């Protein structure tokens, strides 16, 4: 197996990394924690869904912050290229595919199926790979300590021990076969019972066959009897069909005869009624002509009455209009005066409007003047000068206090400074190391120090006295200032109040002055408009005198001479129409003597005739109906006679049939009884046949069972032979020499492989020997034939033999072994041993075609021909490929 490529997506620290292995020795190099070993974990995960990490769940392999991860690995074996896709966490999406001629052929899906397929293709599992060609960090030589357990696991010796145990699978299988032989004894008993049961069933079948023959004979007799009655019944049934048809036809004819007889019952009465109303109906047309004449005559009378009413209205209207025209002429002089007054009034309306507005404004101003005077009388003039002077005096005193306080505070600060300086001198007297006074320069003895202390105390008392006096003056001034500040605030509030009152007083005086000026202006304007106002009032008086004449004139103003002429012409036309209608009236009276002279009598006559017409129209409807019925009844009479003849003919045909309803029902009962008997016989026959078939089936089934039981009985000799062979196998496995034989075979093969490998390394050994006795020790032989334990070898030699042993085991167990993976092999190695390891790795390339080396050691780059650099950027591993020329 050669690994060609791996892709890691959201796997451990890799976000999306693709690594191609193109060299014989591929060196993956980078700092610790860069993500190098994650690539080896990816190879293991891709092949076996496992890693070298101690994790709880595969989901922990997903890159932090991501929801899913994926590993894809491409490898070659026997000339074929395979692609494995693994999903971290989700097993159902795992696949293995064969890449052939540009096509992807899926070989297996889901995690377990894919694992089995990979094991089938590679020929080995995870345990073998981890024990041989995948070497973890710093564990090159661990093969020496793990060798006994590895060999025992690889050779499955523990499985052989399990086989020969008393509760092992061989013992269990012998027990199963023995139980099977015991069960065959019970089968013999079952076989005898089954054969006896078959004999019993055969006897019952013979009895059933005899019973079946008897019942079939009885069924034949009843069937023949039923056929005889059916023949007679079918003949009578055919006659009955004809009888039923004729009876049905006779029933229809009888019904029709009854219906026609019922309808012909009142024929004579209807004929009499028809003849009676025939003469009355003839009056209908005569009365309709009278109604037409009355309607025309009535129209003439209505028009005459209407014209007379119109003439009366026109005459009255003409009289009224003539009177109104006369009054209109009488009022024309008054109307003329009114129009002249109105014209002048309109000319003066603008002036009058101005006068009223000014007068209204003047009234408002006079009221305001009076109100302002009253309010001013209530207010007294306020003088604020005395308050302003007082505030100024207080403010001046506050300023004086502020200036004095400033001087006092400065003086207090100066005194406090002097006091601190004096205290400092007093306190430092004891610490003076020089024997001279720092103030006067005289020799400084204890007496001089005491004197200085007394002088300082006097100065301090004086200073405290001055400071206290100053503080008392400061406190007094501050108190005075606070009182003055309070006084000034009160005075300022009073000043604000008086200033406000003064402002109100002065504002009202100013407003009164403005109102007086406006009053004078308005009075002058009124004087200029007074003459117009007086003229306007005079015109208004005259208007009142003429308004009634004006309104009366307006009422009569719509009457004109032309209107009266039109009205007179209209009156003449109406009189002319009235004359024409009166002529028509006289003509109608002369021609139709039945017409009354007045409209009321005419209306009464019209109502009587219309009522008679309504009665006659109803009679005519009845007349027409009776006429149709009489015509129809004459046809019914003829139909009645024909139906009576048809009735006689049907009665004769029914009599000729000779049908007997009594015999028909008798035959029906006999046939029904025989059919039921025959059905019962058939049911019994069906039961007997069913029982017969069931017993035959039972016999067939039991015969099959007997055949199977006999076949099982034949197994007894085979089972005994199987038990014998298993017992012999168990005896062979119990032989202690078997394990030794197997171990020797494997030891020889591994020894040959190890010696073949180390021959390619530049070592001073002639051979390696493996001793499986006890702890499975390893020894080497020098060129001189000396036997040396591996623990006595140098570090480089031990590494060489460890690699050789791993490769030898892999070669013995794996046909397709061709890749060696070393993860941080230089851990715990000194510089010399690291160099030796490089030489060993270079030599190993002659044995294994592909080596993948993971390291942080820059020296190991010398061993590689294809360099893969890994570095961590943030939380993500990045890969860069570079070649290296040795």
From Swiss-Prot:
Induction: Part of the nurA-rad50-mre11-herA operon, these genes are cotranscribed. Keywords: ATP-binding, Coiled coil, DNA damage, DNA repair, Hydrolase, Metal-binding, Nucleotide-binding, Zinc. Binds 1 zinc ion per homodimer. Pfam families: AAA_23, Rad50_zn_hook, SMC_N. InterPro entries: P-loop_NTPase, Rad50/SbcC_AAA, Rad50_ATPase_archaeal, Rad50_ATPase_DNA_repair, RecF/RecN/SMC_N, Zn_hook_RAD50. Zn(2+) binds at residues 437, 440. SUPFAM superfamilies: P-loop containing nucleoside triphosphate hydrolases, Rad50 coiled-coil Zn hook. GO terms for molecular function: ATP binding; ATP hydrolysis activity; zinc ion binding. Residues 181-240, 320-416, 450-657, 682-718 form a coiled coil. Signal peptide: none annotated. One of its GO terms (biological process) is double-strand break repair. ATP binds at residues 32-38, 137. Residues 391-489 form the Zinc-hook domain. The keyword Nucleus does not apply. The keyword Hydrolase applies. Its cofactor is Zn(2+). Belongs to the SMC family. RAD50 subfamily. The two conserved Cys that bind zinc constitute the zinc-hook, which separates the large intramolecular coiled coil regions. The 2 Cys residues coordinate one molecule of zinc with the help of the 2 Cys residues of the zinc-hook of another Rad50 molecule, thereby forming a V-shaped homodimer. Homodimer. Forms a heterotetramer composed of two Mre11 subunits and two Rad50 subunits. Interacts with Mre11 and HerA. Part of the Rad50/Mre11 complex, which is involved in the early steps of DNA double-strand break (DSB) repair. The complex may facilitate opening of the processed DNA ends to aid in the recruitment of HerA and NurA. Rad50 controls the balance between DNA end bridging and DNA resection via ATP-dependent structural rearrangements of the Rad50/Mre11 complex. This is DNA double-strand break repair Rad50 ATPase. The gene is rad50.
């Amino acid at each position: 197996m050669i690994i060609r490529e791996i892709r890691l997506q959201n796997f451990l620290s890799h976000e999306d990394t693709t690594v191609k292995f193109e060299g014989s020795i591929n060196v993956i190099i980078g700092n610790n924690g860069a993500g190098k070993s994650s690539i080896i974990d990816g190879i293991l995960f891709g092949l076996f869904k496992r890693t070298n990490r101690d994790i709880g769940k595969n989901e922990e392999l997903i890159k932090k912050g991501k929801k899913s991860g994926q590993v894809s690995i491409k490898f070659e074996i026997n000339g074929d290229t395979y692609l494995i896709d693994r999903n971290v966490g989700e097993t159902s999406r795992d696949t293995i595919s064969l890449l052939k001629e540009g096509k992807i052929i899926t070989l297996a899906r889901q995690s377990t199926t894919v694992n089995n397929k990979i094991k089938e293709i590679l020929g080995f599992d995870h345990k073998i790979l981890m024990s041989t060609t995948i070497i973890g960090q710093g564990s090159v030589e661990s093969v020496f300590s793990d060798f006994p357990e590895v060999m025992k696991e690889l050779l499955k010796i523990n499985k052989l021990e399990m086989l020969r145990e008393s509760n092992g699978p061989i013992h269990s299988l012998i027990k199963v076969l023995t139980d099977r032989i015991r069960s065959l004894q019970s089968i013999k008993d079952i076989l005898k019972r089954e054969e006896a049961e078959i004999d019993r069933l055969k006897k019952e079948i013979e009895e059933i066959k005899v019973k079946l023959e008897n019942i079939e004979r009885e069924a034949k007799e009843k069937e023949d009897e039923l056929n005889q009655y059916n023949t007679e019944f079918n003949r009578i049934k055919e006659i009955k069909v004809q009888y039923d048809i004729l009876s049905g036809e006779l029933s229809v004819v009888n019904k029709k005869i009854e219906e026609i007889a019922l309808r012909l019952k009142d024929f004579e009465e209807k004929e009499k009624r028809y003849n009676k109303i025939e003469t009355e109906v003839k009056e209908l047309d005569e009365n309709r002509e009278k109604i037409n004449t009355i309607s025309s005559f009535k129209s003439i009378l209505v028009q005459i009455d209407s014209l007379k009413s119109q003439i009366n209205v026109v005459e009255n209207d003409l009289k009224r209009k003539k009177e109104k025209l006369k009054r209109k002429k009488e009022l024309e002089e008054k109307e003329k005066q009114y129009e002249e007054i109105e014209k002048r009034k309109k000319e003066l309306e603008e002036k009058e409007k101005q006068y009223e507005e000014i007068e209204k404004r003047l009234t408002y101003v006079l009221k305001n003047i009076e109100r302002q005077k009253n309010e001013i009388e209530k207010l007294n003039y306020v003088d604020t000068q005395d308050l302003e002077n007082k505030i100024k005096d207080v403010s001046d005193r506050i300023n004086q206090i502020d200036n004095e306080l400033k001087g006092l505070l400065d003086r207090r600060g100066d005194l406090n400074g002097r006091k601190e300086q004096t205290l400092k001198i007093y306190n430092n007297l004891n610490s003076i190391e020089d024997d001279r006074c720092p103030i006067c320069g005289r020799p400084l003895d204890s007496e001089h120090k005491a004197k200085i202390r007394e002088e300082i105390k006097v100065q301090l008392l004086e200073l405290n006295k001055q400071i206290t006096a100053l503080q008392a003056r400061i406190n007094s001034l501050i108190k005075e200032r606070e009182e003055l500040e309070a006084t000034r605030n009160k005075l300022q509030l009073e000043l604000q109040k008086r200033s406000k009152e003064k402002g109100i007083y002065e504002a009202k005086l100013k407003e009164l002055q403005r109102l007086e000026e406006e009053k004078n202006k308005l009075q002058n304007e009124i004087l200029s408009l007074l003459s117009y106002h007086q003229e306007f009032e005079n015109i208004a008086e005259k208007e009142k005198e003429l308004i009634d004449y004006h309104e009366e004139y307006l009422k009569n103003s719509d009457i004109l001479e032309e209107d009266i002429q039109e009205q007179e012409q209209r009156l003449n036309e109406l009189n002319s129409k009235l004359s024409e209608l009166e002529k028509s009236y006289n003509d109608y009276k002369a021609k139709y003597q039945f017409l009354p002279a007045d409209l009321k009598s005419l209306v009464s006559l019209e109502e009587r005739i219309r009522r008679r017409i309504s009665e006659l129209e109803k009679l005519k409807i009845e007349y027409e109906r009776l006429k149709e019925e009489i015509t129809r009844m004459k046809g019914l009479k003829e139909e009645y006679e024909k139906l009576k003849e048809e009735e006689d003919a049907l009665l004769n045909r029914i009599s000729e049939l000779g049908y007997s309803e009594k015999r028909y029902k008798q035959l029906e009962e006999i046939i029904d009884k025989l059919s039921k008997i025959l059905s019962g016989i058939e049911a019994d026959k069906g039961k007997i046949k069913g029982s017969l078939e069931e017993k035959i089936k039972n016999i067939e089934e039991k015969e099959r069972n007997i055949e199977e039981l006999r076949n099982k009985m034949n197994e007894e000799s085979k089972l005994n032979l199987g038990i014998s062979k298993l017992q012999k196998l168990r005896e062979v496995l119990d032989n202690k020499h078997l394990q030794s034989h197997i171990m020797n075979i494997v030891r020889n093969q591994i020894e040959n492989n190890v010696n073949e490998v180390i021959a390619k390394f530049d070592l001073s050994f002639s051979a390696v020997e493996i001793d499986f006795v006890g702890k499975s020790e390893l020894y080497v032989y020098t060129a001189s034939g000396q036997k040396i334990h591996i623990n006595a070898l140098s570090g480089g030699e031990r590494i060489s033999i460890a690699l050789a042993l791993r490769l030898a085991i892999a070669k013995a167990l794996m046909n397709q072994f061709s890749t060696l993976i070393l993860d941080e092999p230089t851990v715990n190695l000194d510089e010399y041993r690291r160099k030796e390891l490089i030489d060993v790795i270079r030599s190993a390339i002659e044995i294994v075609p592909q080596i993948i080396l993971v390291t942080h050691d820059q020296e190991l780059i010398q061993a590689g021909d294809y360099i893969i650099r890994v570095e961590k950027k943030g939380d993500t591993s990045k890969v860069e490929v570079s070649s290296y020329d040795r």
